Design a protein with these regions (language model features):
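Short alpha-helical segments enriched in small residues
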Residues: 2-131, 141-156, 182-365
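A generic structural motif
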Residues: 170-181
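Phosphate-/polyanion-interacting regions in eukaryotic proteins
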Residues: 134-135
Length: 365
């Protein structure tokens, strides 16, 4: 089943925070759309773009700016050879089967079309389209793609499941499992868990998985971030209830902050530098001592585009995770990409180390 998102209105296209909110909400309803189209209400091809998108997809969500809504309603009605009727204070296609404030749903030839009028800085109207995809997401760690496919594809064939792995970072894949008509996704997952114990995250959201398992185990975590600049803290605090497990974090960008706030020794910085395993180990211990948490994560590196040297080029990053019992893992990474992508990869590498040092609560399948 194909899905599509159409965003109408130039004002929406460049508001990245609002677009991220729209995408996150839609993913909860129809997963990740197979196609996303951006178009302005004044585009001369608007009619044909909508006609083509609706023809190609089965589930279509059309998000319009406030001043594009009425025009889109006319176009959608024309495409369905319908008139417009006043419903809930909206002039919308007459065959709309469900309608609420700023949202309505049409069913045409087994297709579902949900049109929404959105406003920046406001809560999105309700999505009326219902999730129908049989796809589920899970993650696999500590396997490379060839090995992952060799192990999972025979199982997938046995249970009539189509799998699509996506590489998050080295050794961490997000896998979409799509159930065919006669497939058995529950038995597929049981077999996967039996085949790969302590390598499977059976949850669609990796960060929510970490937060929920910390809460179940009544464990706390603290962060000492340098090159990631608070990104890991941001990832964790997107989840409601994280205050029960997240003690806090320090963005220790300058060496003087690493020394005075985290207790990193001057001789460590002078001898090894801030971008070093030795520094990250002391950052881990320093933030754990300050917060009295059960786990700590630390990052230090060169995200670029400047700051690299021959010995430590751009993309050189050290990440670490530790437990209060003294279990510590630190890794040196050589990453590629722009500044933001290097930071994101660093964050996930650090979180993967957390899964390992806390394997008794995260990977106890």
């Amino acid at each position: 089943m194909k899905s599509a998102l159409v965003v109408v209105g130039k004002s929406l296209r460049y508001n990245m925070a609002f677009l991220n909110y729209i995408h996150a909400t839609i993913i909860q309803h129809i997963d990740l759309p197979d196609q996303t189209v951006y178009i302005d209400k004044n585009d001369k091809d608007l009619f044909f773009v909508l006609e083509d998108t609706i023809a190609r997809a089965d589930e279509i969500i059309i998000v319009t700016s406030h001043d594009s809504f009425n025009l889109i309603n006319k176009v959608v009605a024309t495409l369905g050879e319908e008139s417009l009727e006043l419903k809930k204070g909206m002039l919308i296609p007459s065959k709309a089967t469900l309608f609420e404030e700023d949202s309505y749903l049409l069913k045409r030839d087994k297709k579902h079309i949900n049109v929404l009028r959105v406003r920046e800085t406001h809560k999105l109207p309700n999505l009326l389209i219902q999730k129908s995809s049989a796809a589920k997401l899970f993650s696999v760690i500590d396997l490379e793609e060839d090995a992952l496919k060799a192990l999972l594809e025979p199982l997938a064939q046995n249970y009539e499941i189509k799998i699509t792995p996506t590489k998050l970072i080295d050794g961490w894949f997000v896998v979409e499992a799509l159930c065919n008509r006669y497939g058995n996704i529950d038995n597929f997952f049981k077999s996967v868990m039996a085949l790969l114990p302590q390598k499977i995250i059976h949850h669609p959201d990796n960060i929510a998985f970490i937060a929920e398992n910390l809460e179940k185990a009544e464990k706390t975590i603290s962060l000492a971030e340098s090159c990631t600049g608070g990104l890991i803290a941001s990832m964790l605090t997107k989840h409601s209830g994280i205050s029960a497990v997240f003690r806090g974090g320090v963005i220790a960008y300058g060496n003087e902050i690493k020394e005075s706030w985290l207790g990193v020794r001057t001789e460590t910085l002078e001898r090894f530098g801030a971008v070093s395993e030795e520094c990250v180990r002391e950052m881990l211990q320093g933030v754990m001592d300050a917060s009295l948490s059960d786990f700590s994560i630390a990052t230090s590196g060169i995200a670029g585009p400047s700051g690299g040297t021959k010995e430590k080029p751009i993309g050189t990053v050290f990440v670490g995770a530790a437990t209060k019992e003294g279990k510590i893992r630190v890794e040196k990474l050589s990453l590629q990409g722009d500044r933001e992508y290097i930071q994101i990869q660093s964050a996930y590498h650090a979180l993967k180390l957390l899964l390992h040092v806390g394997d008794d609560i995260f990977l106890k399948n």
